[in-house]
């Protein structure tokens, strides 16, 4: 939702506050990898109960995730593989964070936490999959209630401020709602395309 509203305006803010990133070309794929290593390590921090540290790692990795695209666009070095790599490694971070929390709650013998984080993990994977699968057929899938940026931001802030439980419930409900939104959108759009295709066949037959 936030990404849809702000769009590339984020690039301007990054240029303003971090001009040194644009002094000379940097391979954006390296920034993507660096961000993944940093944010992915949050999973280990979550597993060890260092939730504040995990939140800081997620925010730092998220910064790299914003910067890689801005750098690529600024120097005109965006590639299809870069976009693919960025999207794929985002999933790695998502899964690592939730697995870290599942491990933490399992060690603490809190089955409710394990179930809640498992639900978030499954819904997060479905959120990504429904969008990728639907966009093979329809032109564009709207983001929905909670996109990745909102999910990571909420999890990071909740971890740093030590309000993890309410944030996890927000993530669980919001992510499931997002999955349902995307499925309903795909249902409507694919139904429309099917109707148009049938109409064309009828016209051709006549």
Predicted regions and their residues:
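Structured catalytic core of nucleotide-sugar glycosyltransferases
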Residues: 23, 31, 40, 63-64, ...
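Helix-loop interface residues and adjacent transmembrane-helix termini in multi-pass membrane transporters
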Residues: 23-25, 47-48, 77-78, 137, ...
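Membrane-interface alpha-helices at helix entry/exit sites of multi-pass transporters
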Residues: 82-87
């Amino acid at each position: 939702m936030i990404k849809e509203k702000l769009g590339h305006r984020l690039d301007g803010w990054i240029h303003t506050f971090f001009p040194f990133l644009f002094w000379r070309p940097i391979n954006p794929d390296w920034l993507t990898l660096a961000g993944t290593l940093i944010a992915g390590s949050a999973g280990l921090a979550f597993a060890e109960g260092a939730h504040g540290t995990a939140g800081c790692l997620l925010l730092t990795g998220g910064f790299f995730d914003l910067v890689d695209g801005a750098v690529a666009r600024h120097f005109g070095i965006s590639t299809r593989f870069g976009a693919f790599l960025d999207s794929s490694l985002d999933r790695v971070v998502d899964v690592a964070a939730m697995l870290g929390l599942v491990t933490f709650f399992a060690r603490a013998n809190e089955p409710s936490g394990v179930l809640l984080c498992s639900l978030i993990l499954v819904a997060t994977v479905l959120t990504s999959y429904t969008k990728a699968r639907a966009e093979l057929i329809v032109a564009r899938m709207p983001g929905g209630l909670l996109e990745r940026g909102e999910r990571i931001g909420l999890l990071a802030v909740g971890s740093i401020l030590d309000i993890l439980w309410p944030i996890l419930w927000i993530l669980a409900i919001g992510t499931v709602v997002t999955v349902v939104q995307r499925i309903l959108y795909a249902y409507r759009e694919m139904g429309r395309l099917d109707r148009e295709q049938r109409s064309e066949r009828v016209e051709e037959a006549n």
